[in-house]
């Protein structure tokens, strides 16, 4: 069967939607120094983080970037909107479009690799980007877009349309109730908006071995008060990656329209993304052996060339805020996404230490339709000496999944070798799940909840206490892929409390603590399970956290101690994937960012984590370390402006992971690894009109470290890290 016969046409829709809504005024607060002070300090450059005058806590405008603009000390807290990290009892940090450009980051994994609290992981026998936040699985599909669940493209998200990648660490059902897998945290994406200064940027890029791409970024504001804005991003990139025969192609088109009025603010986003992977390395199936194999050569491809995945997404979102009266705002958002994934997957199943394996086959045809929305009212008032910031809201998400598959029989799978891989013909399909060309509904998920929260402040908001609760209802239904009849269902609802406190003994220090709970649908069973594709049920988790945050103007950071308890999923003796145990993660997180010396910028973080299993089958693995979770993970990033050459900057980043285990018995140990990335960029003005050109060059994994990067949560697949990779880009702003 050829690909064309089973892949329906999805033409690129070049549809520009016009959104006409009311007008905005922006308030600007100018800070002026008198002439005497300027003369006194004329040879002293003062660098500190200053807030954007239009930023309002709880709204949709992103938290101002810190210093050089690569990091933001805050981000979106779901329905509570954008918040400064110093004012909330939660751990959150944002990475900006400037970091994305400067590091030539093309996907979300490239961005979150700057944070030790997030561990990138490859998907179950495919090319998906998934993550572990605080040691707990987070599906890339469950990222939010401006706080709205179910809107981001499936599996791999391109960064070209993004202004921010924001990482919230910890259970977050109060804030992001409609999301699915974010027990250990959440990743929120903020789309680009037109700025007051017009944006016109064209770029070309190259990534080894032969990936070449082009991009266009246009933004402009219109109207007497710049109240209308439009931002357009276009990207196309294709070629072979650093691993031989690993071919990839990306096409992205997005438009963001917004309106800033005196009382009303609104935005509309529409995007199209298609990702194609051909012949790239997938995970190695180690479920049939009791050891970790030695590594193949760094650029050797042990996957068959006929393996592929095509993923196409279309998504749209409308948001609106309206100031009812002073300090009281109504907000609403609504979005929808259509996704189609079709692929032929082949993960080599290892047989022995010599590298002999079998090349199986799994064809998947999947359609996902998602609708999501939220609405609410937030406001401020005072009762005596106590200030109140309240929020009442409702959010909901529905998802309809149509999945069909067909796969080969183990006895028919041809023999290959992961060290000396020969190309073989794909084996014939022997078992089938549903009508492959016209899948029936295989699953439906509905999640909805009411939010009530109040942040009380005393002593001029030196002491802040946040109390909130969400009544969350989750319904999960699985259907037989052949008959369409319901096979099983899960239904649960409960009130989930969240409370936290922030105390600021000094203006630059915040001490905080929180207790949060989450209720959400669990992940789907991997393709190695007998119940492949089915939801594992509903997860109820709890977190306790204490910490400290600091912002000294030129340098900031945080220290957190936390504990999370949740049900754990693994394969039972019948190879069914389900919630068969419990996991407790205790850890310490440290973050540091800023510019301690002029021209020297740092972004460093470290996580110490103990992920312990309990309530395992017959208690055999109680007390063992959870699969794929290193006890220590650290990132050290630095930039240095090289003088006297204006615009020349050297960059470096060191990532280190401690050892981890690939099975619950802790008998399969994955060694620790360290990677080093180096780069340089040069920004120069080309003419008197100040047209700018920026040249960036970098090498990821400079030492060509050959390492296993981790294992999936079930312990089925082992993933190899990326080899040495060269990348160059040129951007021209006009």
Predicted segments, located by residue:
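Membrane-embedded beta-barrel scaffold of Gram-negative outer-membrane proteins
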Residues: 319-323, 327-335, 339-345, 512, ...
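Acidic/polar loop-and-plug regions of large Gram-negative outer-membrane beta-barrel proteins
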Residues: 237-241, 254-323, 336-368, 411-439, ...
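Acidic, small-polar-rich N-terminal luminal/periplasmic segments of exported/outer-membrane proteins
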Residues: 43-197, 546
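Gram-negative outer-membrane beta-barrel transporters
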Residues: 460, 563-565, 579-664, 731-733
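Structural signature of Gram-negative outer-membrane beta-barrels, strongest in the C-terminal barrel
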Residues: 258, 368-370, 387-391, 395-399, ...
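Conserved C-terminal beta-signal and adjacent last beta-strands/turns
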Residues: 20, 390, 513, 544, ...
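Surface-exposed extracellular loop regions of Gram-negative outer-membrane beta-barrel proteins
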Residues: 276-289, 398-403, 498-545, 550, ...
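Outer-membrane beta-barrel translocator/receptor signature
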Residues: 160-163, 174-253, 259-265, 314, ...
């Amino acid at each position: 069967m050829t690909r064309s016969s089973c892949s329906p046409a999805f033409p690129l829709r070049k549809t520009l939607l016009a959104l006409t809504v009311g007008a905005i005024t922006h308030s600007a607060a100018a800070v002026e120094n008198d002439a005497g002070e300027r003369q006194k300090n004329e040879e002293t450059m003062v660098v500190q983080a200053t807030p954007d005058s239009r930023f309002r806590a709880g709204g949709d405008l992103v938290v101002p970037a810190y210093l050089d603009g690569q990091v933001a000390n805050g981000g979106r807290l779901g329905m509570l909107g954008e918040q400064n990290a110093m004012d909330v009892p939660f751990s959150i940090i944002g990475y900006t479009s400037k970091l994305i450009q400067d590091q030539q980051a093309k996907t979300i994994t490239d961005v979150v690799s700057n944070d030790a609290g997030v561990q990138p992981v490859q998907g179950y026998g495919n090319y998906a980007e998934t993550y572990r936040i605080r040691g707990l699985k987070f599906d890339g599909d469950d990222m939010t877009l401006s706080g709205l669940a179910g809107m981001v493209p499936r599996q791999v998200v391109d960064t070209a349309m993004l202004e921010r990648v924001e990482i919230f660490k910890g259970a977050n059902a109060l804030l992001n109730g409609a999301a699915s897998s974010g027990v250990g945290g959440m990743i929120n994406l903020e789309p680009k908006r037109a700025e007051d200064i017009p944006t016109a940027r064209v770029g070309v890029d190259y990534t080894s071995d032969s990936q070449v791409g082009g991009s266009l970024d246009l933004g402009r504001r219109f109207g007497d008060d710049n109240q209308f804005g439009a931002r357009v991003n276009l990207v196309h990139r294709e070629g072979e990656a650093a691993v031989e025969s690993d071919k990839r192609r990306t096409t992205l088109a997005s438009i963001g329209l917004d309106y800033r009025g005196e009382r009303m603010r609104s935005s509309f986003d529409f995007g199209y993304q298609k990702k194609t992977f051909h012949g790239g390395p997938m995970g190695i199936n180690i479920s049939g052996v009791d050891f970790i194999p030695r590594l193949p050569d760094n650029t050797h491809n042990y996957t068959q060339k006929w393996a592929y995945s095509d993923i196409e997404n279309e998504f749209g979102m409308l948001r609106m805020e309206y100031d009812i009266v002073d300090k009281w705002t109504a907000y609403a958002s609504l979005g929808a996404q259509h996704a189609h994934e079709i692929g032929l997957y082949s993960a080599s199943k290892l047989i022995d230490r010599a590298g002999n394996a079998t090349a199986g086959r799994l064809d998947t045809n999947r359609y996902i339709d998602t609708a999501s929305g939220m609405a609410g009212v937030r406001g401020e008032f005072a009762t005596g000496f106590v200030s109140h910031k309240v929020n009442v809201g409702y959010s909901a998400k529905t998802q309809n999944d149509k999945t069909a598959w067909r796969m080969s029989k183990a006895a028919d799978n041809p023999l290959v070798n992961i060290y000396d891989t020969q190309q073989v013909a794909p084996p014939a399909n022997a078992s089938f799940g549903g009508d492959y060309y016209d899948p029936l509904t295989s699953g439906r998920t509905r999640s909805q909840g009411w939010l009530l929260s109040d942040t009380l402040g005393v002593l001029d908001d030196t002491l802040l206490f946040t109390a909130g609760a969400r009544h969350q209802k989750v319904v999960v239904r699985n259907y037989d892929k052949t008959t369409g009849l319901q096979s099983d269902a899960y239904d649960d609802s409960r009130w989930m409390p969240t409370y936290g406190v922030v105390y600021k003994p000094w203006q630059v220090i915040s001490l905080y603590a929180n207790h949060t709970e989450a209720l959400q649908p669990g992940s789907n069973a991997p393709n190695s399970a007998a119940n492949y594709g089915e939801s594992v049920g509903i997860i109820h988790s709890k977190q306790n956290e204490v910490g400290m945050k600091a912002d000294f103007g030129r340098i900031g950071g945080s220290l957190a101690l936390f504990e999370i308890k949740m049900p754990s999923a693994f394969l039972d003796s019948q190879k069914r994937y389900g919630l068969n145990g419990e996991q407790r993660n205790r850890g310490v997180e440290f973050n540091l960012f800023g510019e301690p010396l002029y021209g020297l910028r740092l972004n460093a973080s470290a996580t110490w984590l103990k992920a312990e299993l309990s309530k395992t089958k017959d208690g055999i693995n109680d007390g063992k370390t959870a699969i794929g979770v290193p006890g220590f993970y650290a990132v050290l990033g630095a930039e240095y402006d090289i003088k006297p050459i204006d615009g020349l900057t050297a960059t470096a980043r060191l990532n280190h992971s401690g050892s981890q285990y690939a099975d619950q018995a802790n008998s399969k140990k994955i060694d620790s690894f360290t990677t080093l990335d180096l780069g340089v960029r040069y920004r120069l003005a080309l003419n008197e009109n100040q047209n700018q050109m920026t040249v960036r060059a970098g090498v990821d994994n400079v030492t060509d470290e050959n390492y296993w990067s981790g294992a999936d949560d079930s312990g089925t697949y082992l993933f190899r890290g990326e080899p040495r990779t060269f990348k160059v880009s040129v951007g021209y702003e006009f």
